[in-house]
Amino acid sequence: MPETGVRNGAFGADKFGLKNLEAVYWNFGAPQLYEHALRKGEAMVNADGALCADTGVFTGRSPKDKFTVRDATTDQSVWWAGNQSITPEQFAALYADFLDHAEGMTLFAQDLYGGADPNFRIPTRVFTELAWHSLFIRTLLRRPDTSELAGFVPELTVIDLPSFRADPERHGVRSENVVAIDFVRKIILIGGSHYAGEMKKSIFTTLNYYLPDNGVLPMHCSANVGPEGDSTIFFGLSGTGKTTLSADPKRTLIGDDEHGWSKEGIFNFEGGCYAKCIKLSQEAEPEIYAASKRFGAVLENVVHDESTRVPDFDDGSKTENTRSAYPLEFIPNASLTGRAGQPKNLVMLAADAFGVLPPIARLTPAQAMYHFLSGYTAKVAGTERGLGNEPQPEFSTCFGSPFLPRDPSVYGNMLRELIARHNVDCWLVNTGWTGGKYGTGRRMPIKVTRALLGAALDGSLREVQFRTDRYFGFAVPTSVPGIEPHILDPIKTWADKAEFDKTACALVGMFQNNFTRFEGDVDAEVRAAAPEVRAAAE
């Protein structure tokens, strides 16, 4: 079995049962992987030099096809209300069939780290069938120095074979597409899908399982750090502005999606970014635009002009979930260490399409835990198929429900403790609607959001007066220099005050109904942080 590239010769593919392979290419960089991807017809190079691939049927993750091994260890440690199980025997059969399927293949292997902090990173080996998948995961995770590769011993192994087809009856899964994770053996098997994001999020799920035992809170968030070393964490679901608001030219970007919070500070899990690029423009997001238009970037499902190979980022005919993967070093003000000290501020972003949340509110640690466990935003027509004219609430616990292997209260309690220990200021920011709900109101002006966020991060919001919100109980500033006072109080932006009250009460009820599943896992202080309609202030 020919093996080419820098590697640990004593810990090769045979250690994982991979045998009779055509070849294994180890730790190849972008130029070599481009060559193989083009030679194999997996991808094409566009006019900017980016490697471009289509993912076929699967243009996003398939959460219903993700399974976790339920054994004596994970029976008690995994949150089974949010995760699907298979037996150890079913996983063993799946693993054996993966190994059989791989015989005769050429595989690409990457030795990488999940995590920028040497104290907590997890050495990860990824075998892929596709060369462009190898470049993708090399871009997204942390790359070791070449000198480390000869002695690299993985703790976590991923085998990614898009041409594999699972047998639902034999393997205990739903379809021919599968993502299976064995936390005890530390193996991830991915088959049936060409969507590269399955690798990224499966590894993230695994880090979310292991790291709490080491005192690290894993988070689905972006993060940046100011010139004084003051770092900020941004939580938020898709469409809330997490990537946009954390990309601040005055601050250094730590990462755009996955981080850990330890006693030493915060650190990026990744070494690259995986940005949505539908309607990407130089004017709106110049750094992401530039990073996506150069050699080394990997574009998924982006439509191109057939003759010129120029990308059309406005064309969503293949999918609205077009993606660009690129190394962090493609962003001019990104941190190459991926690490920062203890956060000074924590921001939870919500695109409230009901138009009743204030543009900014200060949270107590208990309120922060409540809103973290709630993970609220709202969907509107145009963001997802099948939505009508009315906004639809979305609650994704810990702002990352699909990636949580442990009970959400594990992460919520860790967050609350870290906030209290490090005296972190917590903020809820509404990037959604004002002056009415979606359809009658308008989107919160980005200039207002940036100004309020700037005032929170530089400490000037500490100097203003606050009121207690009648519906949600958090503290809302009554005046902020440079901001018109009425926009700080949502009811004052609505023409119909009675309709505002009706809508606000309805949203309070949605929060309360969603949180019933967590009430047995939190203490009285967190339960008391729940929204309720309070008497109006005099």
Swiss-Prot record:
Cofactor note: Binds 1 Mn(2+) ion per subunit.
Sites where the protein binds Mn(2+): 201, 220, 257
UniProt xrefs under PROSITE patterns: PEPCK_ATP
Main localisation: cytoplasm
Binding site for substrate: 61, 195, 201, 323
EC number: 4.1.1.49
Keywords, sorted A to Z: ATP-binding, Cytoplasm, Decarboxylase, Gluconeogenesis, Lyase, Manganese, Metal-binding, Nucleotide-binding
Pathway(s) annotated for this protein in UniProt: Carbohydrate biosynthesis; gluconeogenesis
Location(s), subcellular: Cytoplasm
Gene Ontology terms, MF aspect: ATP binding; metal ion binding; phosphoenolpyruvate carboxykinase (ATP) activity
Catalytic activity: oxaloacetate + ATP = phosphoenolpyruvate + ADP + CO2
GO cellular component: cytosol
Matches recorded under InterPro entries: PEP_carboxykinase_ATP, PEP_carboxykinase_C, PEP_carboxykinase_N, PEPCK_ATP_CS
UniProt key word Transmembrane: no
Highest taxon above the source species: Bacteria
Residue sites binding ATP per the record: 201, 220, 236-244, 285, 323, 449
Main enzyme class: lyase
GO biological process: gluconeogenesis
NCBIfam families attached to this UniProt entry: pckA, PRK09344.1-2, PRK09344.1-3, PRK09344.1-4
Function: Involved in the gluconeogenesis. Catalyzes the conversion of oxaloacetate (OAA) to phosphoenolpyruvate (PEP) through direct phosphoryl transfer between the nucleoside triphosphate and OAA.
Protein family (similarity comment): Belongs to the phosphoenolpyruvate carboxykinase (ATP) family.
Protein name stated in the entry: Phosphoenolpyruvate carboxykinase (ATP)
Gene name linked to the record: pckA
